[in-house]
Amino acid sequence: VGGLNYLVLGFVNGIACGFSIPISWTFGAKDYKEMRRYTANTVWLSIFFAVVLTIVTVALTRSVLVWTNTPENIIDLADIYIRTIFAGIPFTLLYNVTSALMRALGDSKRPLYFLLVASFLNIGLDLVCIIMFHMGAFGAAFATVVSQAVAGLGSLLYILRHYPELRWSREEGCFSLTHCAKLCSMGIPMGLQCSITAIGSVVLQGAVNGLGSDIVAAQTAGGKAAQFLCVPLESIGTAMTTYASQNMGAKDLDRVDRGVYTALGIGCVYSIASFLILRVTDKLLIGLFLDASETAIMANAQSFIFWNLSLIHISEPTRPISIS
């Protein structure tokens, strides 16, 4: 379910990041009235996308799992897990939008703090739900959704208390087709960019699922390890979204150029370093997701992560340029 999960949640993360671009732009230009209008319309669009995505994904999950040849011995567990995750899309979008708003105004620390709290809470709830209450796949998904809800609601309360400049008047809070069109022109392409590769992963999953549950387990573990190593590169791109938007709004194009080249350099250095480290520690990294005694699955996971990251680390350093 990794590809399907990333397809939807990657889109959610992307649209939230895209919605923040006009807000960053107007903040950099010190046009606070327009910034509040974009913020208000971001809220209306987020509610719309949360409702539509939740209904569509929950309704279609089982059909997609069948279409991708999910093995019969795990399809029910996969269905329960992914449906529960998708039922929590409103909370996922809430955290992504509120954290994007804080980053748009130059605060990248608080989103991290709320995410750390959610991560530790998720670990604790996993132990409680799976080990103590034996809730299985549903328990793991439920723990994730609750953690996202805590992070999202915490971020929202923080914004309401500490960012009075985002509080819009009745006039500024009215739905505006012009502002929504601008937000969608940024958010939807960003959402597709963050999820488009997952479409290929979903199609590939259909072929992988036909090879049996051992190969599925290997591909899932390898995919988690690969995603773990790619997160810093994606974060550089997300940071460049805010950085470039604020400086474009302030009309400081030289600073944008310097930021892009700096981000590209950081991405290249990280890609080379992480790939070299991976060659030494791949078994240890995959061991975080697999039992070391499952040698056949471990070998297949090592093969997957090697070829996966060999290709990704060639293209991924250019992500900051394409996003910014």
Residue ranges of predicted features:
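Helix-terminus/linker motif at the lipid-water interface of multi-pass membrane proteins
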Residues: 1, 65-72, 128-135, 195-224, ...
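Small-residue-rich hydrophobic transmembrane alpha-helices
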Residues: 1-55, 92-111, 218-282, 315, ...
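Transmembrane alpha-helical core residues of multi-pass small-molecule transporters
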Residues: 2, 49, 117-121, 143-151, ...
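Residue-level signature of transmembrane alpha-helical cores of multipass secondary-active transporters
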Residues: 46, 85, 111, 115, ...
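Short membrane-interface helical motifs at transmembrane helix boundaries
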Residues: 52-83, 273-295, 302
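Alpha-helical transmembrane segments of multi-pass membrane proteins
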Residues: 72-95, 227, 233, 295-315
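Membrane-interface helix-loop junctions in multi-pass transport and translocation proteins
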Residues: 119-153, 283-287, 296
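Interhelical loop/hinge segments that connect adjacent transmembrane helices in multipass membrane
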Residues: 144, 155-197
